[in-house]
Amino acid sequence: QLFADYFLGCGVAAGRFVFGDHIDAKPNFSVACNAVDAGRFHPDAAARAATRAAWGITDTDRLAGFVGRLNHQKNPLFLMEVFAAMAAQDPHWKLLLVGTGEMEPEMRAAAARRGLTDRVIFAGVQSDVPAFMNAFDLFLLPSNFEGSPVTLVEAQGCGVPCLASTNVPDDGSVTDLVHFLPLAAPLTDWAAKAEAIAAHGDHDDHWAALSAAGYELKTAARRMEQLYDKLGGHA
């Protein structure tokens, strides 16, 4: 803060973490959203059907999903505990994990201990993330900490209900698809909440709200251009 004239953060919480608790109250701070491409992350019934078929997900299966690194930040072992509670309530649930990381061996061992090996899919690193997002019936993000997770916006863009921990900042929660629970809540509460919100999943288009909040890529680019013009004395 000694040398900068203007400050940007991907969210208010991220800005406070980097620049200080009261940075968002200053006139020289703005949020530059982690925007995503609406042309890629949108409801796509064909991609949903194809991806589910490719990974052996039947019409009667219910698919919970996660996209990200399997590391301490993302709290994957807790995610597995949540899924185990969900699976105990409904045998049709499966879990698909997109991504890898240092905790993958522990995740595989946890799935085996709970007898869930045939219901947990480790998909590894994938390039077509929108197709997987569309395949999900529920997106899980029980992180220990986050800045402003782009995956939460991507899931909303695809119309997927989301259940995140209260450790995840609510900056990107701009639709009624996102729900939060504390990590201290009982696993049965997590399972019940997952069941409730997944039951009302619609895979509808929510881009009007996301764009208005600044999370559509072209909208975000225009806002950034306007900010540069203003700071450069051209506006």
Named regions from a protein language model:
Residues 42-57:
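A short helix/loop element that forms part of the nucleotide-sugar donor recognition site in Leloir-type
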Residues 125, 144:
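Aromatic "clamp/platform" in nucleotide-sugar-dependent glycosyltransferases that forms part
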Residues 161-165, 170:
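Short hydrophobic beta-strand element within catalytic cores of glycosyltransferases
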Residues 53-54, 58-62, 76-121, 233-235:
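A conserved nucleotide-sugar
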Residues 2-42:
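A short, active-site helix/loop in glycosyltransferases that binds the activated sugar's phosphate group
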Residues 202-235:
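A charged, aromatic-enriched C-terminal amphipathic alpha-helix characteristic of glycosyltransferases
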